[in-house]
Every structure is written in C-alpha cells, then in structure tokens.
Swiss-Prot record:
Organism expressing this protein natively: Shewanella amazonensis (strain ATCC BAA-1098 / SB2B)
Enzyme class: transferase
Positions that bind (2S)-2-hydroxy-3-oxobutyl phosphate: G86, T87, R128
Cysteines paired by S-S bonds: none
UniProt function note: Catalyzes the formation of 6,7-dimethyl-8-ribityllumazine by condensation of 5-amino-6-(D-ribitylamino)uracil with 3,4-dihydroxy-2-butanone 4-phosphate. This is the penultimate step in the biosynthesis of riboflavin.
Assembly and binders: Forms an icosahedral capsid composed of 60 subunits, arranged as a dodecamer of pentamers.
SUPFAM superfamilies: Lumazine synthase
BP terms from Gene Ontology: riboflavin biosynthetic process
Protein name: 6,7-dimethyl-8-ribityllumazine synthase
Annotated positions binding 5-amino-6-(D-ribitylamino)uracil: F22, A57, F58, E59, A81, V82, I83, F114
C-alpha cells in the first residue's frame, strides 16, 4: 500500500493571506495566529508571506481568485469573521464566501484554507480568535501547510 501525506514544514512555500477588514477586532487576531503558525511550524520566511486586505468576507473570493491567477503563490489563507445579526445577510455572505473560496481552489489547483469565522455571537468569534477555542487563523495556516505539501507529494509520487 502506498500512502501519500503532507507534512507541516514548508520553508520555501509562498503564501498569500487574504484578510477581511470587517470585524477587524477579531480578524487581526486570526491574522496574527496565521502568521505565527506559518513562521513557527512551517518555517516559512516572512519574505514569502503576502497579506492582501479586502473590505469584507464577501470580497475574499475575488481577491483570492486574482491571487491564485497570478501563479506566484503555493497557497492562500482566507481570513474573516461573519457574525450573525438580525437579518438573513449573514447566510448570504457566509455561504457565498465559502462557495467562492472553494471554487477558487478547484479552478486553480491551489489550496485555499478557509479561516473565516461564521458565528452566532461576538463572544463566539472572540473565543475562536485566540482565547478559549484556540485560534482558527493558526489552524487555517496548519491546514494550508499540509495541503501545499500533500499536493506536491501527489505530483512527485503518483
């Protein structure tokens, strides 16, 4: 049996982090967690990390698509926070963001890690951005590092 796996270390990986400015009090913590994880666990050089800021989560897929189309990056991390309010706006933004980012990944054969919080409350968002429930930005970075490596391994081994 042949097993193909990805590892976390990716010293030469070029990573773009596409970040929503909306709900920045949460998203900046996600960004810090992602960058810290890329550097500490992936040993990615700061020179190989590019941050692209967009207004909100709805704009993340288009920016990620443009980044992927450039061919300059091994992977993309999308970070944002969509917090439920009193209208259906949450459902539209969260759903389209998710679908759009998945489409970018499949269209360009580039891993796009989903670090967009979709929570019912501000408290839940804060918990997931570095307090009680860990830092989902860091988790998204770990997932991206593994996917970059597993895709490279598939190319080499299969």
């Amino acid at each position: 049996m042949h097993i193909v796996e990805g590892h976390i270390e990716a010293k030469s990986a070029k990573v773009a982090i596409v970040v929503s400015r909306f709900n920045s009090f949460v998203v900046e913590s996600l960004l810090s967690g992602a960058i810290d994880t890329l550097k500490r666990f992936g040993q990615v050089s700061e020179d190989n990390i590019t941050v692209v800021r967009v207004p909100g989560a709805f704009e993340l897929p288009l920016a990620a698509k443009k980044v992927a189309a450039s061919g300059k990056f091994d992977g993309i991390i999308a970070l944002g926070a969509v917090i439920r309010g009193g209208t259906p706006h949450f459902d539209f933004v969260a759903g389209e963001c998710n679908k759009g980012l998945a489409q970018v990944s499949l269209e360009f054969n580039t891993p796009v890690s989903f670090g967009v919080l979709t929570t019912d409350t501000i408290e839940q968002a804060i918990e997931r951005s570095g307090t009680k429930a860990g830092n989902k930005g860091g988790e998204a970075a770990l997932g991206l590092l593994e996917m970059v490596n597993v895709l490279n391994a598939i190319d080499k081994e299969l």
